A protein has these predicted regions:
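N-terminal Rossmann-like FAD-binding beta1-loop-alpha1 element of flavoenzymes
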Residues: 8-33
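Conserved Rossmann-like nucleotide-cofactor binding loop
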Residues: 16, 39, 276
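Glycine-rich FAD pyrophosphate-binding loop
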Residues: 26-46
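Conserved redox-cofactor binding core of oxidoreductases
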Residues: 40, 92-183, 200-204, 379-386
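Glycine-rich active-site loop/strand segments that organize a redox cofactor
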Residues: 52-89
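Glycine-rich loop(s) and the adjacent beta-strand/alpha-helix scaffold that form part
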Residues: 178-181, 185-252
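An anion/pyrophosphate-binding glycine-rich loop and adjacent beta-alpha core
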Residues: 229-231, 235-361
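Contiguous C-terminal substrate-recognition/catalytic subdomains in enzyme active sites
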Residues: 346-386
Length: 386
């Protein structure tokens, strides 16, 4: 068995663990970081950047957002079922965090909104001097390089299995490397940054009541089994209710070019399995609100319905709602993308020549769907005439 020692051991090599390891080292501690994956960064490698409030980017862009405003919005949204002190501290420290990352060489393209009605708090990491995907990987690399400069020791492909307790106090961790060799790390403090349990259907079922693949679909980032939560609980940590943020998305993520998901996320008619409209489609730009609405529908399913006239309009003037994740230059090949998706037997995309045919494909009563569409069109005509 290999034995190591440090002032602080960090469990998890995502942005939380990387940031914690750098900060601890800057404060003068010797640090060992143990990471289950073979590379650092975690799911954030697919991300584009963190939140910031009161930053110079926002000031330059004349963004009117303050810690107090953001805090009220967040607490209103969560109905105060979160740790208010933690949320406030997170927002208060976000400006310094952005500057801290900049000191490591991270460049930000600016502060942006995720969707039109949101606030411009999303600080997107510059990729080749502009906006691109996976800027989070650049940020994570910068933190790791800074950590190495400060003497942080990184151990990838190393799974922590247990927190060592002595006389009621944390004394380190037990882990195994890729070869199966046990590693004992003695430390004065253990920082857990292992993320959630999205890749653990059992935890999701037991703690939240959802059956994965049936009434709930998630990203299920490989390796997010809830190990850190389990180890903390075994060590005697206090617990709270486990929550999950619901968003809406097509169950099959292999949707081809961006034009398909981006087009189906537009505020067009959405119906449930009964053929009934159940949401103000303007809210579709907020994936969480829409996810909440879909979650209480029969079979937790919603269908977004488009016709050729809508597609023609999008081709002429562009999409109504865009974001930096799904932002195709145009949707000129939309029909071909749909045909290709259907030919590939994608179970979540349908195409029909009539409302009745579509209803039968979706398992909806044709008369009910016809009535809903007629009512929807009447309301659109009434608005256009005003």
């Amino acid at each position: 068995m290999k034995k190591l020692e440090a002032d602080v051991v960090v469990v998890g090599g995502g942005p939380s663990g990387l940031a914690a390891s750098v900060q601890a080292a800057e404060d003068g501690a010797s640090v060992i970081l143990l990471n289950k994956a073979d590379i650092v960064g975690g799911a954030a490698n697919m991300g584009m950047g963190p939140l910031g409030i009161g930053t110079r980017q926002q000031q330059a862009q004349m963004v009117d957002i303050s810690v107090e405003k953001a805090f009220k919005m967040f607490m209103d949204y969560t109905h105060w079922r979160v740790d208010a002190n933690l949320v406030k501290k997170y927002f208060e420290n976000s400006k310094d965090t952005i500057e801290w990352l900049e000191d490591m060489g991270v460049e930000f393209a600016g502060a942006y909104k995720y969707f039109p009605k949101s606030e411009a708090t999303w600080h997107i990491v510059a990729v080749n001097g502009g906006i691109g995907r996976n800027g989070g990987a650049i940020m994570n690399k910068a933190m790791m390089e800074k950590g190495k400069e400060l003497g942080v020791e990184y151990y990838n492909s190393t799974t922590v299995e247990k927190i060592i307790m002595k006389d009621g106090k944390v004394a380190g961790v037990m882990a195994k490397d890729a070869t199966g060799e046990e590693i004992e790390v003695s430390a004065k403090a253990v920082i857990i940054g292992t993320g959630g349990a999205g890749d653990n259907p059992q935890v999701i079922k037991e703690r939240m009541g959802y059956t994965w693949g049936k009434d709930m679909f998630n990203f299920a980032i490989p390796g997010l089994k809830g190990d850190g939560i389990r180890m903390a609980m075994e060590a005697g940590a206090a617990t709270t209710d486990m929550n999950i943020e619901m968003i809406y998305i097509l169950p099959n993520s292999d949707m081809g070019p961006d034009c398909i998901p981006a087009t189906f996320m537009q505020p067009n008619l959405m119906v449930n399995k009964e053929g009934r409209r159940f949401i103000n489609e303007e809210e579709m730009q907020n994936t969480t609100f829409t996810g909440n609405a879909i979650a209480i529908q029969p079979e937790r399913i919603g269908f977004s319905i488009l016709d050729s006239s809508i597609i023609k309009g999008y081709k002429k003037r562009g999409l109504d709602v865009t974001n930096f994740v799904h932002h195709p230059d145009n949707i000129d090949d939309f029909e071909q993308c749909v045909d290709d998706s259907i030919a590939a037997k994608n179970p979540d995309v349908y195409k029909a020549d009539s409302i009745e045919e579509l209803a039968n494909m979706l398992g909806i009563d044709p008369e009910a769907l016809e009535d809903t569409i007629d009512e929807y069109n009447d309301m659109c005509d009434s608005y256009d005439e005003q």
